[in-house]
Amino acid sequence: MINRPFWQERMEQAWSEAPIVWLAGVRRSGKTTLAQSLGAERSLYVNCDLPAAEDMLRDPVLFFRQCDRPVVVFDEIHQLRDPSRVLKIAADEFPKLRVLATGSSTLAASKKFRDTLTGRKRLLHLVPALTGELTAFGATLEQRLYHGGLPPALLAATKPPAFYREWLDSFFARDIQRLFAFRDINRFNALFEYVLRQSGGQLEVTKTASALGISRPTVESHLQALEITQALTLVRPFHGGGQGEIVRQPKAYAFDTGFVSFARGWDPLRPADRGLLWEHLVVEAFQASWPGEPVRYWRNKAGDEVDFVRPRGRDVVDAYECKWSADEFDPTALKAFREYYPKGRNYLLAPITGRAYGKKVQGLELTVCGLAALENPDR
C-alpha cells in the first residue's frame, strides 16, 4: 500500500472541523485504498457495494452503538437505500464518532441525499496523483502526464489502452447510469470523448451540440453529470465588472491527463502537448489545496488571458501563469490583467526542481515555482 500523507493529513484536518468527511473522486482514484490506510484497529470498514451492508445498517442506532472503533468508513455509500439517514444519525446521536464516506460523485449527485448535514460535513476531493506524490509511486513527471494519475495506470510499466477503455465503460454503467438514468451509452461516450479531445480549451455548448448532432439540453445535462461526478471541471471566467472582461465562456478540463492523451492519440508526447497537460496538473493542485473553491481564469475581449486566478481578500487577486518552460513566459496578458486588478501576487508555475525564486519581467514581480507551492500552500 502506497502511503499518501498529503491526503491523510487533509482527512485529519477535516475531521477536526466536522464529524463527517465526504471523500469524493472518480473511479479508481484510490479512495478505497486511502480509506483502508486508516487501519483496522482504528476504523470499521463497511463496503456498501455488498448486499449485507444494507441489512447491517437497517438499524443505524444499534449499528453505531455496537461500534467499538472511533472511525467508521462507508465505502461507496451512495449504494445504500437511504445514506442521508445513516449519516444524519451518526452526526446527531454519536457526535464523538468520525465518519468517512466515499463515492465517485458529490453528495448532490444522487436524489438519495438530502441537505441534512449542513455544517457537519467536509468535502475532500481526491484528485489523481499529485506531483508531490510521484516519488512514492516510483513515477516520473513524464509518466504522470502520459499515463495519468489514476494509480493502476500510473504504476503500469507501459501505457495500458485497455485500462482507459474499460474505465470509460465502467464509468457509464456504475456511475452515470445509476445516478442519472442516462440510457444511451453511445451518445454519452461521444460527448465525453469530444470533451476529452477539447480539454483545456473553451467549451461552447451550441458548438458542441452541432458537432455531435445532439440537442443543446442533452449536452447541458450530460456536462452537468460529468461535472457532478468530477470527471470534468468547468473553469469559469473571473470578472469584477470591468469593461471588456469575458464573463461567461468557461474552459473545460477533463479529470486526468492520461485520458486526455489517450483520447487525442498523443503517442509519444510532444513539447506542446506537455504544456497543455501541465495546465491540467495545476487545476488538480488547486482542487486538492483549496477544496470547495472554484477554479477561475481571466480573459478580456482583446484576447489577453491569464491561465488561473484566485481572489484573496478584498480587491486582491493572485495570478497564476503555467509554462512547461519558464523561459517561454510572455508578460503581455498578465500586464493587461494587472491594469484591472493591481493588487495580488504573480506566480509562474513551471516544472522546476528546487526552491521557488523571484524575478522581474517588464516591471512585473513574479514568483517562479513548481506545484509544491500549491500542493503545500501553508508550508
PLM regions and their residue ranges:
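Pre-Walker A adenine-sensing motif
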Residues: 1-15
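Hydrophobic anchor at the beta1->P-loop junction of P-loop NTPases
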Residues: 23
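Structural recognition of the conserved hydrophobic beta-strand(s) that form the central parallel beta-sheet
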Residues: 73, 98-104, 125
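Domain-level recognition of nuclease-like catalytic cores that cleave nucleotide substrates
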Residues: 354-379
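Conserved lysine of the Walker
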Residues: 31
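Hydrophobic positions on the alpha1 helix immediately C-terminal to the Walker A/P-loop
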Residues: 34, 38
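Short regulatory helix/loop adjacent to the ATP-binding pocket of P-loop NTPases
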Residues: 107-122, 138-139
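Accessory nucleic acid-recognition modules appended to NTPase machines
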Residues: 158, 162-316
